[in-house]
């Protein structure tokens, strides 16, 4: 059975009836993390909300006043996951998030168009595709697509859009002679009922369960951004369709305007200016590294030159790295001196190094790490790692001063 959303992809609401409602759980992504949410699985007599399938994400919307968080297909049914229960046999008005739906329609029909043209022009078969949040990707069964080929595909795609080519939805049975003639990547194992064909008049006929525009003019435009290396002997073609092209142009213009202000030159000079900046930064970083190494040596030699230098050396610097700390330890020497060195923000996080006689470092390294709320490891008289509570540095110094006072360290 085709759902109402498949029979009329432009319908934004539907009056229907709740068939069943059962407690359920679902893993939903929030901020990059998946959390298990308790709710209810609702079946309706029919639905205007598209369940995920055919490479197209599911719709969002409302059943009455209850938000629909997911729609998935289970066999012939569309299962709506909601947070609040709904009474069976109740008449409800189902509404969709039209902006999300129409965006998916534009990308999906755009994929059919690009796929058909790539195949007819160059024999590039589509093996899969992904409708992403920002861009869509078509995986082509070819190791290489040239710039000239991309331009030709894009040109014909936009020509078909300007020609207002109609898009028809037809239903056929699996025993229909046409079944073996249309483009398809196969039916799901649990498919039941008639097979849905999306027919771009004179361009393509393809088996598909997704929602599509009724005319290519509704795509507005297609922009192929380029390609990326895909799986073995595959190429990923990246494209935008419809409103996404306009949003991309807007973002690109705003980025260009910001760069013009920051770089103090015109768009045609941005690449050269950034290249010069990168080279300057690289040179400065190299010079800074040399100066830090020299500073590490001078700091260590200054300590060694003091007659009353003692058996403990402690230093904190905001700037530096592990190499800076290890140079100091190497120059001072760790056989007769205990060193506690830290790099980073005094109140938050950074790096630390405890170096000295192996017995002391092995015993107190983990304790220092614990006080600093850090992670680290040690061997051969050195224990180093990352600290999350650099503000506890003074507590470590007190501990190590006590250690020095209670342990004999032979000093030259």
Swiss-Prot record:
Gene3D superfamilies reported in the protein's UniProt record: 2.40.30.130, Threonyl-trna Synthetase, Chain A, domain 2
Source organism per UniProt: Xenopus laevis (African clawed frog)
A single cellular component GO annotation: cytoplasm
Cofactor: how and how many bound: Binds 1 zinc ion per subunit.
Signal peptide extent: none
UniProt name for this protein: Alanyl-tRNA editing protein Aarsd1-A
Cofactor(s), by name: Zn(2+)
Recorded GO MF terms: alanine-tRNA ligase activity; ATP binding; metal ion binding; nucleic acid binding; Ser-tRNA(Ala) deacylase activity
Keyword Zinc: yes
Task performed by this protein: Functions in trans to edit the amino acid moiety from incorrectly charged tRNA(Ala).
Keyword Calcium: no
PROSITE patterns xrefs: AA_TRNA_LIGASE_II_ALA (PS50860)
Pfam families: tRNA_SAD
Localization: Cytoplasm
GO biological process: alanyl-tRNA aminoacylation; regulation of translational fidelity
